[in-house]
């Protein structure tokens, strides 16, 4: 699981930051899941290691232009390239009508099926590896945050130890690999976890924008490995944050702290903090770290790989 930030500015692009988009790269299945798709996202993709042909799912947080104005162009380009078999898009009410209107008035024909899912709080997608859920955030329009949870993977089965214990190969191996308890012909009871390496714990990611501090964001981000949270304003500009229902850097840090997240990436910065201004983005980082130390500033094309975690060492089983 790799995160690539394709746009980290709020509202409008700047010389160094495009508007919102984050790519979640899943190399094990040759897929990319996109979160938001602001203007020029496909241009950002061309400048990155993300492959347009691998985009399989797109998750839209809300209907403001800096999060959706790149969507129609990206979908059209995928069709012209001819190497996308299907696209699933998830987002708030109105997203489907928006895309239908764009397609109708531009007379764009998609050569592949597109399915738009109108989301509601709860689980919105699940397969054998991942679960994606969403919850409502607090913004001027309907907005949702997303959480991606990777399922735990069983540890490697120790065939050599199984042979040394005299366990016959066949169906018993399958049961033990699944962690089940089996009874051998001689009466010995073997527990599957005693022959398997520690499971790999599934990794978790939460994406929260646009929103002011809210309990929904805290709930969504519980115990995640990475929280990506908007930080449109500095703490001294909190009045504007409350007026526009955006977060300050300190609000984002408070969400991460309350949720016991492992790492926080700030994004969606107002252009008012660009280099040369009295208050700059580095000041937002200082504010956040005073509350939640493992905080980083996102920037365009930053890539971060979520680390894997193992459960405590398994109990060893002696031979003899």
From Swiss-Prot:
Pfam family, one: Lactamase_B_2
Residues involved in Zn(2+) 2 binding: 66-67, 210, 268
Residues annotated to bind Zn(2+) 1: 62, 64, 139, 210
Cofactor requirements of the protein: Zn(2+)
Family matches, as CDD domains: RNaseZ_ZiPD-like_MBL-fold
Keywords linked to the UniProt accession: Endonuclease, Hydrolase, Metal-binding, Nuclease, tRNA processing, Zinc
Cofactor note: Binds 2 Zn(2+) ions.
Active site per database record: 66
EC number: 3.1.26.11
GO molecular function annotation: 3'-tRNA processing endoribonuclease activity; zinc ion binding
UniProt-listed InterPro entries: Metallo-B-lactamas, RibonucZ/Hydroxyglut_hydro, RNase_Z/BN
Keyword Oxidoreductase: no
Catalytic activity: Endonucleolytic cleavage of RNA, removing extra 3' nucleotides from tRNA precursor, generating 3' termini of tRNAs. A 3'-hydroxy group is left at the tRNA terminus and a 5'-phosphoryl group is left at the trailer molecule
Gene3D superfamilies with a match to the protein in the record: Ribonuclease Z/Hydroxyacylglutathione hydrolase-like
Lineage: superkingdom: Bacteria
Keyword presence, Nuclease: yes
Similarity section: Belongs to the RNase Z family.
Subunit structure: Homodimer.
Described function: Zinc phosphodiesterase, which displays some tRNA 3'-processing endonuclease activity. Probably involved in tRNA maturation, by removing a 3'-trailer from precursor tRNA.
Protein name: Ribonuclease Z
Naturally occurring in which organism (per UniProt): Cyanothece sp. (strain PCC 7425 / ATCC 29141)
């Amino acid at each position: 699981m790799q995160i690539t930030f394709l746009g980290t500015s709020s509202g409008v692009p700047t010389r160094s930051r495009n508007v919102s988009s984050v790519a979640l790269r899943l190399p094990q299945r040759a897929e990319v899941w996109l979160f938001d798709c602001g203007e020029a996202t496909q241009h950002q993709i061309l400048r990155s290691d993300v492959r347009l042909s691998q985009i399989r799912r797109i998750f839209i947080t809300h209907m403001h232009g800096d999060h959706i104005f790149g969507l129609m162009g990206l979908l059209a380009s995928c069709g012209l390239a001819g190497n996308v078999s299907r696209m699933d898009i998830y987002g708030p009410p109105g997203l489907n009508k928006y895309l239908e209107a764009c397609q109708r008035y531009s007379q764009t024909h998609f050569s592949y099926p597109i399915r738009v899912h109108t989301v509601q709080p709860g689980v919105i997608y699940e397969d054998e590896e991942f679960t994606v859920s969403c919850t409502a955030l607090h913004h001027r329009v309907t907005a949702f945050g997303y959480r991606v949870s990777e399922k735990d993977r069983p540890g490697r089965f120790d065939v050599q130890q199984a042979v040394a214990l005299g366990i016959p190969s066949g169906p018993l191996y399958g049961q033990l690999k699944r962690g089940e308890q089996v009874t051998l012909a001689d009466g010995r009871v073997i527990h599957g976890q005693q022959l398997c390496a520690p499971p790999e714990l599934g990794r978790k990611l939460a994406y929260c924008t646009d929103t002011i501090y809210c309990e929904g964001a805290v709930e969504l981000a519980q115990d995640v490995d990475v929280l990506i949270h908007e930080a449109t304003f500095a703490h001294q500009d909190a009045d504007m944050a409350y007026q526009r229902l955006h977060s300050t850097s300190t609000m984002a840090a408070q969400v991460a702290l309350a949720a016991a997240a492992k790492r926080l990436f700030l994004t969606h910065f107002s252009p008012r903090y660009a280099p040369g201004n009295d208050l700059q983005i580095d000041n937002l980082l200082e504010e956040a770290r005073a509350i939640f130390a493992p905080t980083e500033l996102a920037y365009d094309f930053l890539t971060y790989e979520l680390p894997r975690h193992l459960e405590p060492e398994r109990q060893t089983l002696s031979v003899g």
